[in-house]
Regions:
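Short, small-hydrophobic-rich alpha-helical interface motif
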Residues: 4, 23, 27, 37-48, ...
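A short, charge-rich alpha-helical start-of-domain segment used by transcription regulators
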Residues: 5-25
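Short helix-capping/turn signature of helix-turn-helix
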Residues: 18-21, 29-32, 135-142
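Arg/Lys-rich amphipathic alpha helix in sigma70-family domain 2
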Residues: 50-57, 67-88, 111-112, 164, ...
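DNA-recognition helix of helix-turn-helix
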Residues: 63, 70, 74, 118-122, ...
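Internal acidic/polar
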Residues: 83-112
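Short, basic, alpha-helical segments at the C-terminal edge of helix-turn-helix-like DNA-binding modules
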Residues: 174-182
Length: 182
């Protein structure tokens, strides 16, 4: 990061390679449009490069870049009035460490696809702030503090969003015939 702050284009390109997937993933969730998300990801990195001097080196780079991506996506949604969408699942909401990717809930591929569809439908019914908090927690592996930084909300609010979303997802999946405890 020090070299990028010093103006090294090669160092910044390395940052882009490192964060391209999480930024694109976040933007696809926000917009529901991969082509638009790719454009917004490029815009995100241009903004990050232009604002490197504003980066607080005491913070995590991932949270800063994802915050820029979030703002860029929200701005685009406001301009285009796109409804936010999200996909994913996760682990314990009270765990302060970043989440690991969840293991498949069922070994049967057909059942796994059906569960994924049920989960996607359930996620689509959540409030956008809850969907985004869940996605940042379980897809991007951010801590609650980092989620708070990205969404500009207190850590306790980030915890609450994730907890309430998980509770609602469990209720919706159970209503659809899935046992959320398996």
């Amino acid at each position: 990061m020090g070299q990028a702050l010093g103006g090294s284009q090669a160092a910044f390109e390395q940052i882009v390679r490192r964060y391209q997937r999480p930024v694109l993933s976040l933007l696809v969730r926000l917009t529901g449009d991969r082509a638009l998300a790719e454009d917004l990801a490029q815009e995100t990195f241009v903004k990050a490069f232009r604002n490197l001097a504003a980066f607080d080196v005491t913070r995590r780079l991932s949270a800063w870049i994802l915050r820029i991506a979030h703002n860029t996506g929200i701005d685009a949604m406001r301009r285009r009035r796109i409804r936010a969408v999200s996909l994913d699942t996760g682990s314990r909401p009270d765990d302060p460490t970043p989440a690991e990717p969840a293991a498949p809930l069922t070994p049967d591929p057909v059942e796994r696809v059906a569960l994924q569809r049920a989960l996607e439908a359930a996620l689509a019914t959540l409030r956008p702030d809850q969907r985004e908090a869940v996605a940042l927690r379980y897809e991007e592996g951010l801590s609650f503090d980092e989620i708070g930084q990205v969404l500009r909300i207190p850590e306790v609010t980030a915890r609450s969003h994730v907890h309430r979303a998980r509770k609602e997802l469990a209720r919706l999946l159970a209503a659809a015939g899935w046992d959320p405890r398996r």
